């Protein structure tokens, strides 16, 4: 192991998505190898490092607010330096440097060695697959690709992150093995688009091959997130059904169902093709749970087209669904369109779709009452009637999906423990139950 070179203390604030989290984890592992220490409180650090998000306006505003708070601490003498990295810098480096001269350095999304150098550390090539987890130690992400080569009109990710670049399979397997050795039990595969994994490196889709190799390891749960619907390799659905440690779960963001909107979004798929894909997935694996996301209020979306989305969601009955109002982002291709739907109307459409989904989710969850389910305990929490355990089933991804609230038993299962739980009640987004037994 490399010897310590510096003992600077750093407070690392990682904002945005799970892909950003992985970047921050890699940075922290590299810095720690050079003797850098990381603190849990900004007040205890010499340096504040903020890994920003620049995807939508709300995320940009959060990033700016955190930068300003860090600058205030620097001006007050609480910290010595402030560094800013990530997606916001990638989009607005010149403007940020001009408006925030108090920030010592700005770094983009592909400048890890330069960030380390600024911290007084160096990049260790032999540690390229090491990470210091910022997630609970039993659950982690495996980022299988960088960037995106799709051209969805509402999205600025290709501009921020560059073209799609698959990570070599052997490298991913080594990284996964390290995560497993460090106690990770749930592995969540992520990328901007997992569907085309391998095409740029191997000339063909390799998601199924990677999934089977990972399944041969000793992870209890492996989960697939961010599957692009066009060209999704259906053999993956068969593998999910055949392998007990791959969750019966697929995150398949569709974004809309109306053909004119899908064309404008440049999604490369029609409503009918979406329906056929969903039908094929469910036919191949009736146990699978599907998650999707939708955008309401896209430029040109009429009330009729929104009602088409309502009807679509009502007939497909997704197991998990998130809906977001369209954001008119200046670095996305859709910025050239007129933002026709008023903000208030966008929010009303989001609420209307989510009310429909809430009723669907409530009925789906009611079907679990009385059953015995495997639950991964994430954390204890103080409830109104004492300590409860917060966990998830295989049908629920971290942070975005449902939770299972369990009465604390004796002995109390620790975070990262799998339990058999009897489901005694439900709401739209929660299951309630009791622990019947701990699992090996």
From Swiss-Prot:
SMART domains: Elp3. The keyword Lipid metabolism does not apply. GO terms for cellular component: cytosol. Keywords: 4Fe-4S, Cytoplasm, Iron, Iron-sulfur, Metal-binding, S-adenosyl-L-methionine, Transferase. InterPro entries: Elp3/MiaA/NifB-like_rSAM, Methylthiotransferase, Methylthiotransferase_CS, Methylthiotransferase_N, Methylthiotransferase_N_sf, NA-bd_OB-fold, Ribosomal_uS12_MeSTrfase_RimO, rSAM. Binds 2 [4Fe-4S] clusters. One cluster is coordinated with 3 cysteines and an exchangeable S-adenosyl-L-methionine. GO terms for biological process: tRNA modification. Its EC number is 2.8.4.4. Residues 8-124 form the MTTase N-terminal domain. It catalyses: L-aspartate(89)-[ribosomal protein uS12]-hydrogen + (sulfur carrier)-SH + AH2 + 2 S-adenosyl-L-methionine = 3-methylsulfanyl-L-aspartate(89)-[ribosomal protein uS12]-hydrogen + (sulfur carrier)-H + 5'-deoxyadenosine + L-methionine + A + S-adenosyl-L-homocysteine + 2 H(+). [4Fe-4S] cluster 2 binds at residues 148, 152, 155. Residues 366-437 form the TRAM domain. Pfam families: Radical_SAM, TRAM_2, UPF0004. Residues 134-363 form the Radical SAM core domain. SUPFAM superfamilies: Radical SAM enzymes. Its cofactor is [4Fe-4S] cluster. One of its GO terms (molecular function) is 4 iron, 4 sulfur cluster binding. It is found in: Cytoplasm. This is Ribosomal protein uS12 methylthiotransferase RimO. The lineage of its organism: Bacteria, Pseudomonadati, Chlorobiota, Chlorobiia, Chlorobiales.
């Amino acid at each position: 192991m490399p010897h310590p070179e510096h003992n600077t203390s750093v407070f690392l604030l990682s904002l945005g998505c799970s892909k950003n989290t992985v970047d921050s984890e890699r940075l922290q592992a590299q810095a720690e190898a050079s003797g850098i220490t990381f603190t849990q409180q900004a007040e205890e650090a010499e340096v504040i490092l903020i890994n920003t998000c620049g995807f939508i306006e709300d995320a940009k505003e959060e990033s700016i607010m955190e930068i300003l708070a860090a600058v205030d601490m620097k001006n007050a003498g609480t910290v010595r330096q402030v560094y800013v990295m990530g997606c916001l810098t990638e989009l607005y480096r010149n403007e940020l440097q001009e408006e925030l001269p108090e920030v010592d350095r700005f770094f983009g999304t592909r400048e890890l060695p330069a960030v380390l150098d600024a911290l007084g550390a160096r990049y260790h090539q032999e540690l390229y697959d090491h990470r210091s987890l910022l997630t609970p130690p039993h659950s982690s992400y495996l980022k299988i690709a960088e960037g995106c080569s799709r051209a969805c009109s509402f999205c600025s990710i290709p501009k921020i992150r560059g073209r799609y670049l698959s990570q070599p399979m052997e490298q991913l397997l080594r990284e996964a093995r390290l995560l497993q050795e460090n106690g990770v039990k749930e592995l969540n595969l992520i990328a901007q688009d997992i569907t085309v994994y391998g095409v740029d490196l191997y000339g063909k889709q390799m998601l199924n091959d990677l999934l089977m190799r990972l399944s041969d390891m000793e992870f209890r749960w492996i989960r697939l997130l961010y599957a692009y619907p066009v060209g999704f390799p259906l053999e993956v659905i068969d593998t999910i059904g055949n392998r007990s440690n791959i969750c019966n779960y697929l995150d398949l963001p569709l974004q809309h169902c109306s053909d004119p909107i899908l064309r404008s979004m440049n999604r490369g798929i029609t409503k009918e093709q979406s329906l056929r894909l969903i039908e094929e997935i469910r036919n191949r694996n009736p146990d699978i749970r599907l998650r999707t996301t939708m955008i309401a209020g896209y430029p040109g979306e009429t009330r009729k087209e929104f009602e088409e989305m309502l009807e679509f969601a009502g007939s497909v009955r997704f197991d998990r669904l998130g809906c977001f109002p369209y954001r008119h982002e200046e670095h996305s291709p859709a910025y050239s369109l007129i933002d026709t739907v008023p903000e208030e109307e966008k929010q009303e459409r989001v609420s209307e779709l989510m009310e429909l989904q809430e009723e669907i989710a409530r009925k789906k969850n009611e079907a679990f009452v009385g059953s015995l389910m495997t639950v991964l305990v994430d954390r204890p929490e103080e409830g109104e009637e004492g300590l409860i355990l917060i966990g998830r089933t295989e049908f629920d991804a971290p942070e975005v999906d449902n939770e299972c609230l369990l009465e604390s038993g004796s002995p109390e299962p620790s975070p990262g423990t799998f339990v058999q739980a009897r489901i005694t009640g439900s709401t739209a987004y929660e299951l309630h139950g009791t622990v019947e037994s701990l699992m090996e």
